[in-house]
């Protein structure tokens, strides 16, 4: 009998607590850097064309997924750009089921209404971006007039998700433009019948501005939530309290980071295995000043061997005290899984989530 996601999670957790050979829990693959939005807090939809060239074909993508499965990775996130612009996305989701991986897709939801049944049959978790309840503000933040279309997509997905055994989540990016609305978005996510909401403070790196095209809408200076830091400190305790009544999946430990402003945490990049759109693994993580990329498709290395190489282990050690990043996908796992005794409540919450949605 195949192991469930919960058993995989617990097995990896206990192994990593006692062994120096640390295994990743999660994988992520950048499906594409193409995007049909032009968000003011994200550079990808605003990039110059040269950064969008080259993507794995279906066969290559499945080879990456096979390596993830062979390494006992529990779940894979399909990221972008906008993953639904890949016509083979459902096929990739079905391959995940075949090899025993949970699949999660982060999408802007623009194509969801017309594809809800197909997506929810193929994938385990759909995470749909919704940052505001104001259509005009949505247009200003996301650069496209698609608010009604996205909400319709969420509703259609919720209708079929139960029968298709797929969890529907909302993801809200917190930036200076929507801080006042966050509690209302949380409440609306529950009204829509979704399985939960994730809250993600917008991340900005200085070098991202060097990648944007002429006419870019990327505006980190005005969209930075730190412009309204005093209001963030009022918002965070409110969200922590709302977790008692609303399905906020974001951990207390992540939220408290933005209450205290203390980003001097121990980074654990071994928790996540990140692969870009051409099949290269990023070492030690996706966005450090020393990150290098290595192909997993050219036959020169296998993930399972390369992960424990001296080169990779050394790179991870160099960023263990990194304080230049507050990306959700790094901060939260590093706190919950890297400091479990301090964040036991969050760890138990994660285990509960796997028990609820871990169908593999």
Residue ranges and their predicted role:
Residues 25-26, 250-255, 274, 305-316:
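Short, intrinsically disordered, charge-biased short linear motifs at domain edges
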Residues 22, 71, 121, 192, ...:
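Structured loop/turn residues at beta-strand edges in well-structured enzyme cores
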Residues 43, 116, 142, 285, ...:
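Short, flexible helix/strand-to-coil boundary loops that buttress conserved ligand/catalytic motifs
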Residues 24-26, 169, 322, 326:
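Short, solvent-exposed beta-strand edge segments and adjacent coil->beta transition regions
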Residues 10-14, 18-19, 262-264, 280-360:
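Flexible mid-to-C-terminal extensions adjoining Fe-S/redox cofactors in radical SAM and related proteins
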Residues 2-118, 124-125, 136, 205, ...:
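Conserved alpha-helical substructure of the radical SAM core
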